[in-house]
């Protein structure tokens, strides 16, 4: 029995390694954890400082095809349109072989609605792919019964625009051979989002601002949910957070690489 378990275990490990190689054989991936303080009212200079730190942690090789994953909330209060003033900074440091995933507030010009979005941009900061968060945090990202409560001066607690509108599409992000299921922040706790996703999903990417939790166990709980989702769906999981645990988790729930809470740097996939 012990011999059978050993043989089966060895086969599973080898199978995982082959699957890992197949998932990322065409594009190199870097997961970034910047460890920014949670701050409101950031000015242009502070946002530029954040960009420069993200670039330093990304350490881009202009000749290497790479997907960089930055967390949610790194441009606190700034919308996608407002950070376009840093286009030259991105173009100077990244090449046409690079794509960047990050979280930002996005305005739909036609409807006037704001979304909490995961964006995939090129080295011109042009949006290549996007995903709008579907599970919004009550009072944090939208105000329930807003038309009634705003009469009493109530508003959502997060900085920036009025209530976000939830996304209505279960859209995967396709990049080369990566079929990515995008999850923003606490969407990782909702199993139904993953169960209803594209059957060809071969990678789950979760970006999160975990600074909201402070010194509580919140970031650790978020991280544990990521492990559960990878096992339940037999899928590799990449997690990029600010102030939380960033990690690469294989399809069996094993932690291949990680950056701990309040640790800055990058991990490679």
Pin down the residues of each PLM region:
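Enzyme catalytic cores with a strong preference for nitrogen-chemistry domains
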Residues: 1-269
